[in-house]
């Protein structure tokens, strides 16, 4: 600090000290920084993408004294706020209300034949999202972060430079946090594929579809199929194999498939769309079912109002002109980074879905903040630990999972060193209801001390109960630690501390 102005010493205001520290950290990077071109605006930190990860990193950097800017071409908040987690959770809550209405009579209430209005919930949902957009805008303004509206592409310059609407911007530290986009089949693969929509289009629907076909077996497909079915749409879920969520623990994969079918979703197994045609009564799908050991059969699904592709997500990196600065990607376009979120180009970083690892909003936020602390607070070891990240699927009933699946644990520790505890029961909520859902739980333990390395569950309340158990797994709790915890009765969560 001796080389800094006297005003930035011990007695300086916190904001000035933070700015000085940020400047010191930025200057501490190895290599000789090149001055920007005369027609280029310069910042300490330039973030491409105004989604959860980018905004979290920019705001944390600003708190630490960096002069930051965010480039965003659309609405602030990214996928999560606009076409993901937030509006999805509103629709899931709506679907849960619909399910509970079926149980009112069993709980002693007079028959409730409430008529559902898609228009009402859509209007309220969209208004809520709009309020969040405004909050994000205000937060950036309060943090003195400049917002640059437009599409960013890397351009020529003495150091990594970004061009937006004909203007150039640069910084010693540039973060790419552009997220991902839904995958859509190419017309050459499936003629008429463009007649379908994606999860983005789901939030643009003006009416509840009468007949829906969801294609995909991942969590997005499962969630949307469950929502539409619960709200009254005749729904089919088309999957290539015989189970959904095949990357999850086998217990969850099997049980979720069963619960979907019990809830009235038609699960079309070993089935794929071959062609889509538009008719006077909607869409007509030609599908092929190829059950192993049997001859493939072709059938038609007529009068489809909503065909929704939920077959994965692609990195939103195509328009960035990454080759201009030589940033390396994989074959799908995911930006390659190391454990500290560094790309192969000095001073350029990436977080979130564009990297293709753990596509979850809290992961992008945590990684972005850790990066800001490393760059502007001199915390050189600041990085996100990607192990034991908890996740929830808002299915019906919801799924909670953290840590290793049984198969992953066996692969890591050996079959003889893994012990499984599991249970299945009917939640007390259903003690008096005609409608039933199960709750299933599995605890994966490793080695002699029976360290808990994985917890997987599906049932009412599993979404909310997971967070606390995830802390225990992250801290290295053992089965004995769970056993020594007094149960809360009567709850579903007590099952995890009474497993035998």
Swiss-Prot record:
Self-association and partners: Homodimer; disulfide-linked.
UniProt binding sites for glutathione: 52, 59, 136, 369
Family of the protein in this entry: Belongs to the class-I pyridine nucleotide-disulfide oxidoreductase family.
Transit peptide feature range: 1-26
Entry annotation: catalytic residues: 489 (proton acceptor)
Cofactor(s), by name: FAD
Domain free text: Each subunit can be divided into 4 domains that are consecutive along the polypeptide chain. Domains 1 and 2 bind FAD and NADPH, respectively. Domain 4 forms the interface.
Keywords: Acetylation, Cytoplasm, Disulfide bond, FAD, Flavoprotein, Mitochondrion, NADP, Oxidoreductase, Redox-active center, Transit peptide
Protein name: Glutathione reductase, mitochondrial
Gene responsible for this protein: Gsr
Function: Catalyzes the reduction of glutathione disulfide (GSSG) to reduced glutathione (GSH). Constitutes the major mechanism to maintain a high GSH:GSSG ratio in the cytosol.
Protein species of origin: Mus musculus (Mouse)
Residues the record lists as N6-acetyllysine modifications: 75
Note: The active site is a redox-active disulfide bond.
Record-linked InterPro entries: FAD/NAD-bd_sf (IPR036188), FAD/NAD-binding_dom (IPR023753), FAD/NAD-linked_Rdtase_dimer_sf (IPR016156), Glutathione_Rdtase_euk/bac (IPR006322), GSHR/TRXR-like (IPR046952), Pyr_nuc-diS_OxRdtase (IPR001100), Pyr_nucl-diS_OxRdtase_dimer (IPR004099), Pyr_OxRdtase_I_AS (IPR012999)
Keyword Oxidoreductase: yes
Enzyme Commission no: 1.8.1.7
Biological process terms in GO annotation: cell redox homeostasis; glutathione metabolic process
Residues involved in NADP(+) binding: 217, 220, 223, 240, 246, 312, 359, 392
Pfam family, one: Pyr_redox_dim
Stored SUPFAM superfamilies: FAD/NAD(P)-binding domain, FAD/NAD-linked reductases, dimerisation (C-terminal) domain
Binding positions (FAD): 52-53, 72, 79-80, 88, 152, 353, 361, 489
